[in-house]
Amino acid sequence: MESFIASIRLVAATMLICVAGYSAAVWAVGQVLMPGSAQGSLIAAADGKVIGSSQVAQNFTEPRYFWPRPSAVDYNGAGAGGSNKSPTSTDIADRARETVARYGATAENPLPAELAAASGAGLDPHISERGALYQAARVAQARGLPQAGVEALIHEHAFAPGAFLAPDRLVNVLELNLALDRVETAG
């Protein structure tokens, strides 16, 4: 009986260390090293109301906003993941054709591939700088802003995430759209 009680104590201590201790340690490291990411990278409006996260794509459909990559999960964070459809699926081809048509792409002005294809998780908040520049004319016209000013804002918000590992510069769509709203409000 004594060894049974000792084993119960050992199981309880192990669970306490592995469950509570490990979780607390990971939480503490996250708070110290990456406090913004550990809190969800939330973005708040001027009134303090949370309007999104810089790590999760939102579905912008109005012409006055930059559009993110298509989402296989309809921008639902709870259902994050790619499509289970085969690359030869007619559904995927149909969705790509609809996206190309929505952008008004032509043979002379082809749509960057990323803007027609969903990311692996379906919630990628970034598009390439090239993808944003592709949309600049539409956004500028819809907002009544000079295209050069919209392009300058894109360049201002572009960043290189991994230096030589990911040479393409990226733009966070939500942050860029919020910056456009601020420019329009200030103008």
UniProtKB/Swiss-Prot annotation:
Main location per the UniProt record: membrane
Transmembrane segments: 10-30
Cellular compartment(s): Cell inner membrane
Pfam families for this protein: KdpC
PANTHER family: POTASSIUM-TRANSPORTING ATPASE C CHAIN, POTASSIUM-TRANSPORTING ATPASE KDPC SUBUNIT
Quaternary structure note: The system is composed of three essential subunits: KdpA, KdpB and KdpC.
The family this protein is said to belong to: Belongs to the KdpC family.
Descriptive protein name: Potassium-transporting ATPase KdpC subunit
Annotated gene: kdpC
